[in-house]
Amino acid sequence: MTKGFREIKLEEKEGIKIISLRFNDVLDKEDYELFVPQLENLFKHDGDKVRFLIELENFKGFTLGALWEETKFSFKHFNDIDRIAVVGENRTEKIITEFTRPFTRAEVRFFHTAEIEDAKKWLSES
C-alpha cells in the first residue's frame, strides 16, 4: 500500500504545463508505480514547457526502491522539465531538494510552506 503519494493535478496556461504533486510521510516504490504512469500521460510532448510544483507535508524521505524509480524517471525526462518548485516546512525537505539538482536540467527552487503563492507565481512566469 502506498504511503507518501497524495495527489496529482495538471494546470495549463499560456504554453506552460504545471504538474502539481503532493507527498507526505515516506515515498516508496509502490507510490512511484501509482503516480509515474499518470505523470507519463501528462507528459505528452506538445511543445509546452513542463514545470513541477511539489508539495511536501511531514515528508520523511524515500525508500531505496523509490530512489531507484526516481532516478529512472529523472534520467528519462532529464531535458523535459523546465522548473521545479518544492514547497516544504523543514531543513530535511530543503536538503532533499538540493539532492535532486544533479538529476535534472530544470531550475530547482525550495520555498517554505508560507511561500507557496511565490512558488506558483515563479512557475507561471515565462
Regions found by a protein language model. Name each.
Residues 2-126:
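Amphipathic, Lys/Arg-enriched alpha-helical "gate/interface" segment within cytosolic domains
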